[in-house]
Amino acid sequence: MSTFIGQLFGFAVIVYLVWRFIVPVVGRLMSARQDTVRQQLADAAAAADRLAEASQAHTKALEDAKSEAHRVVEEARTDAERIAEQLEAQADVEAERIKMQGARQVDLIRAQLTRQLRLELGHESVRQARELVRNHVADQAQQSATVDRFLDQLDAMAPATADVDYPLLAKMRSASRRALTSLVDWFGTMAQDLDHQGLTTLAGELVSVARLLDREAVVTRYLTVPAEDATPRIRLIERLVSGKVGAPTLEVLRTAVSKRWSANSDLIDAIEHVSRQALLELAERAGQVDEVEDQLFRFSRILDVQPRLAILLGDCAVPAEGRVRLLRKVLERADSTVNPVVVALLSHTVELLRGQAVEEAVLFLAEVAVARRGEIVAQVGAAAELSDAQRTRLTEVLSRIYGHPVTVQLHIDAALLGGLSIAVGDEVIDGTLSSRLAAAEARLPD
């Protein structure tokens, strides 16, 4: 019995403990769980509502999308049709432009081909004509006939006047021209009293003084001061050269500095010119003027075809004495004997180049020699040597045209083919066959 009561008491204690401590906790847990379930049910209901709303929104969005897609498709179709029309119109315009451009290009190509054909035909015609002319003038008689025909044409030309003047005068202004003319006239009278040795010495001394004045620019400037009283200038030249030159040379220098010169260099040119006149006076007394002129022109042509020799003789960096030695060696090796007057004239010219090209200076010297006799120099180009009759006739015709004696300097150039080319000063009469062929070729279309 006591066992039963003890167990009952223990059970009662357990029940009490469960009711007192466990039941409240479990109750609270159950209540919290119920609240959680109720909240989840509420959330589920809200989610169901949102799902329904989303479904409705989706359905509406699909309908809106279909409507928008239909609208976009319609707009795209309309734009495509409009673009297609624009492209078609643009294609028509472009096709028309290309067609017109193609037509213009065809016309241009046709014109170019036509012009090229004409040009080639013209060049071929000129080439054939040149070949025919070359074959024709291969016969010396036919080539000589071309010269005769040109002389006939030249003979029919209207006369023209030409003044024979010292070439140096063309380089000077009026004051120097008057001074040089007066000096040369005075020297012509004064030279009659000088013998061969006197003229030779005079020429050499004048060249030495000219070289001195070329080096002493200040002295030259004082000697050409344009003052009315020439006494100071005469005294200066006397102090400068007295005892160094002979009396004739000193007299020439006194006369030269007493003149009025337009430029300082004109005085030096005048002194050099008088020295040349002294040597040419020697040639004239010996009856060798023609030989001197011919040798001077021949040496001028040698310089034209030997540019290296011209460069060596005209190199002012080399002392004048060295260039003169070279000149004399060249002249000593010449096939024929060179006239001593020519040697002296060329030597003096090389000494007094003063920056001028030697070939130009020698040609100028030859023209001075010709002008001394009152003659005109005619530079004549021919394809072959002229006969004596043709040369005589040419000289007579040119003398009649220009109203003065003419000296003919002949230059042979086979490239001229036929006819003659004549240059008198700045005037050129070109009647060569080569020039006519060149003129025909120049008239061809570009």
Curated annotation (Swiss-Prot):
Location(s), subcellular: Cell membrane
Transmembrane portions of the chain: 4-24
Keywords: ATP synthesis, Cell membrane, CF(0), CF(1), Hydrogen ion transport, Ion transport, Membrane, Multifunctional enzyme, Transmembrane, Transmembrane helix, Transport
Positions of the UniProt region annotated as ATP synthase subunit delta: 169-446
Subunit structure comment from the entry: F-type ATPases have 2 components, F(1) - the catalytic core - and F(0) - the membrane proton channel. F(1) has five subunits: alpha(3), beta(3), gamma(1), delta(1), epsilon(1). F(0) has three main subunits: a(1), b(2) and c(10-14). The alpha and beta chains form an alternating ring which encloses part of the gamma chain. F(1) is attached to F(0) by a central stalk formed by the gamma and epsilon chains, while a peripheral stalk is formed by the delta and b chains.
NCBIfam families in the cross-refs: ATP_synt_b, ATP_synt_delta, PRK13428.1, PRK13430.1
Functional note: F(1)F(0) ATP synthase produces ATP from ADP in the presence of a proton or sodium gradient. F-type ATPases consist of two structural domains, F(1) containing the extramembraneous catalytic core and F(0) containing the membrane proton channel, linked together by a central stalk and a peripheral stalk. During catalysis, ATP synthesis in the catalytic domain of F(1) is coupled via a rotary mechanism of the central stalk subunits to proton translocation.
Entry's family note: In the N-terminal section; belongs to the ATPase B chain family.
Protein name listed in UniProt: ATP synthase subunit b-delta
Organism: Mycobacterium tuberculosis (strain CDC 1551 / Oshkosh)
